[in-house]
């Protein structure tokens, strides 16, 4: 039984390992997204820092001219500060769900600074959306989302199972050999990551496609 439990713990770790790595990497990138976007889309996001901004109607007219007037105006996100551009979004039937074409206009110079596909009415930029897709589905569509959900479902089993194995097999005497040192390092990392893995599993399932829907139904049933 102990041997099978160890094998199961090993295979679960092997299964969820890629998910943990990608989720940690994309999560870190997501935190740094504002700085990355400012560097990658600098020209589109910034305009003249001195002068008088022109009316929104004039900025929209410039954007409509860039689209040749063939697209329906969807949303406008005015420049939040001097030196930044206005984001004007148009509905484009050739794009995916919740996607729109954004024209970035310098409100002072009335010049188009960028033209790209964005997401949502707030105009989420492509980099942030790519990181979000990678975090949710590993860029593999529904198959990736299913794998992510399965990995999150088994993560708490791996974490608590590892603690149970440690409790059942910890040596009575402290031995200083390579095997015990390796095992001690593994146990130390396991204890250190235990709370994080449990929270990661719970929050991951809450936001997942299938389990998340069931969580929403449960919350509605209990009035949470």
Identify the meaning behind each predicted range.
Residues 1-224:
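Conserved histidines in hydrophobic membrane contexts and catalytic metal-binding motifs
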């Amino acid at each position: 039984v102990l041997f099978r439990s160890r094998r199961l713990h090993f295979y679960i770790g092997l299964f969820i390992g890629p998910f943990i790595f990608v989720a940690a990497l994309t999560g870190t990138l997501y935190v740094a997204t504002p700085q990355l976007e400012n560097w990658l889309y600098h020209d589109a996001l910034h305009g003249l820092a001195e002068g008088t901004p022109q009316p929104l109607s004039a900025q929209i007219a410039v954007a409509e001219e860039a689209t040749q007037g063939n697209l329906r105006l969807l949303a406008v996100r005015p420049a939040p500060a001097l030196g930044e551009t206005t984001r004007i979004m148009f509905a484009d039937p050739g794009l995916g769900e919740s996607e729109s074409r954004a024209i970035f206009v310098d409100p002072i110079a009335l010049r188009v600074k960028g033209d790209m596909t964005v997401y949502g009415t707030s105009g989420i930029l492509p980099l942030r959306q790519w990181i979000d897709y990678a975090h949710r589905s590993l860029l593999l569509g529904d198959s990736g989302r299913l794998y992510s959900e399965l990995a999150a479902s088994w993560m708490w089993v791996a974490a608590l199972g590892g603690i149970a194995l440690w409790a059942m097999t910890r040596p009575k005497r402290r031995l200083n050999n390579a095997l015990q040192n390796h095992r001690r390092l593994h146990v130390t990392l396991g204890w250190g990551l235990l709370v994080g893995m449990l929270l990661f599993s719970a929050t991951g399932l809450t936001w997942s496609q299938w389990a998340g829907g069931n969580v929403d139904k449960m919350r509605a049933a209990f009035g949470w």
